[in-house]
């Protein structure tokens, strides 16, 4: 599908995504938060690695419960990806229960992510059980407006991860 048709069909894609999110959300609040973050991903410009509506729909196409996380750290700290992945791990919890993972990294244009920095992320993703039907979709966007984010009174540039995880419903 070309870009023109993709954009024209976006409202239909969003409605399908909204239905999927509603089905796996534990509450209306989680559903709304997830949709707000998904819209940020879909509408992000200057993406280095793109997540499109089809990627989002595929990652949400499973049974379970949706966990929504928006994690932000100072983009100037040493080992920033290690710190960010550590924060994600704290929020997600037990990797064995994660069936599907969608995450999008936002980084300041003036402090771009280097390939060499992504090793902690790669190590973390490899910790998921490969014999399961685990799905992962990810993207990255450079942004020039990162000091405006919530709870950022110091106006420092931020490294941010939007993480949507579908976890198993074990009783």
Show where each model-derived region lies.
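Tubulin/FtsZ superfamily GTPase core signature
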Residues: 1-171
